[in-house]
């Protein structure tokens, strides 16, 4: 299993269809693949005898607790999420799921997709709808000026392009 993920506070309960599919795939992987593997390893370690000083047994039990915690979180989160896949009535405004191309005062461009907090992925330019930038962008039209207040200070952006993925 990857690194430990502490429980998060629930953000906006929106998610794209792709994000929901990733969470369901993670849940399936944990419950049907990883948990049986770790359970088998714990059973084999327990069969070796003394459990008090059995590092494999102790580590396996810890892994089971982490897997079970993540499974509980995913099940509960998936129940409460609203999948938003349809295009908005006004595609010339920024809403959830939009790819937005921005340009700053120096002419440098950046492109972001507004997604749910469970899908946040800065390497792929996917920002949470709860972020200061996304909150400032939602509802803006093409060519709008957007002043974004972040912990690093204020920055002025211009909305250059708004694009929505095709509906599933």
Swiss-Prot record:
The family this protein is said to belong to: Belongs to the GreA/GreB family. GreB subfamily.
UniProtKB keywords: Coiled coil, DNA-binding, Transcription, Transcription regulation
Residues forming coiled coils: 61-84
Name of the protein described by the UniProt record: Transcription elongation factor GreB
NCBIfam families given in the database record: greB, PRK01885.1
SUPFAM superfamilies: FKBP-like (SSF54534), GreA transcript cleavage protein, N-terminal domain (SSF46557)
A GO molecular-function descriptor: DNA binding
Described function: Necessary for efficient RNA polymerase transcription elongation past template-encoded arresting sites. The arresting sites in DNA have the property of trapping a certain fraction of elongating RNA polymerases that pass through, resulting in locked ternary complexes. Cleavage of the nascent transcript by cleavage factors such as GreA or GreB allows the resumption of elongation from the new 3'terminus. GreB releases sequences of up to 9 nucleotides in length.
GO BP, sorted A to Z: DNA-templated transcription elongation; regulation of DNA-templated transcription elongation
One Pfam family it belongs to: GreA_GreB
Cross-referenced InterPro entries: GreA/GreB_C_sf (IPR036953), TF_GreA/GreB_CS (IPR018151), Tscrpt_elong_fac_GreA/B (IPR028624), Tscrpt_elong_fac_GreA/B_C (IPR001437), Tscrpt_elong_fac_GreA/B_fam (IPR023459), Tscrpt_elong_fac_GreA/B_N (IPR022691), Tscrpt_elong_fac_GreA/B_N_sf (IPR036805), Tscrpt_elong_fac_GreB (IPR006358)
Domain of life of the native organism: Bacteria
């Amino acid at each position: 299993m990857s690194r430990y993920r502490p429980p998060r506070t629930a953000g906006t309960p929106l998610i794209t269809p792709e994000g929901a599919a990733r969470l369901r795939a993670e849940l399936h992987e944990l419950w049907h693949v990883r948990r049986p593997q770790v359970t088998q390893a714990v059973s084999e370690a327990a069969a070796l005898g003394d459990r008090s000083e059995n590092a494999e047994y102790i580590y396996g039990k810890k892994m089971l607790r982490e897997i079970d915690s993540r499974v509980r979180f995913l099940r509960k989160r998936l129940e409460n999420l609203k999948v938003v896949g349809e295009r908005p009535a006004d595609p010339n405004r920024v809403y959830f799921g939009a790819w937005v191309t921005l340009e700053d005062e120096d002419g440098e461009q950046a492109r972001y997709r507004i997604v749910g907090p469970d899908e946040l992925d800065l390497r792929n330019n996917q920002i949470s709808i709860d972020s200061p930038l996304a909150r400032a962008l939602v509802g803006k039209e093409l060519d709008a000026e957007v002043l974004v207040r972040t912990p690093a200070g204020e920055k002025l952006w211009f909305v250059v392009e708004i694009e929505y993925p095709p509906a599933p």
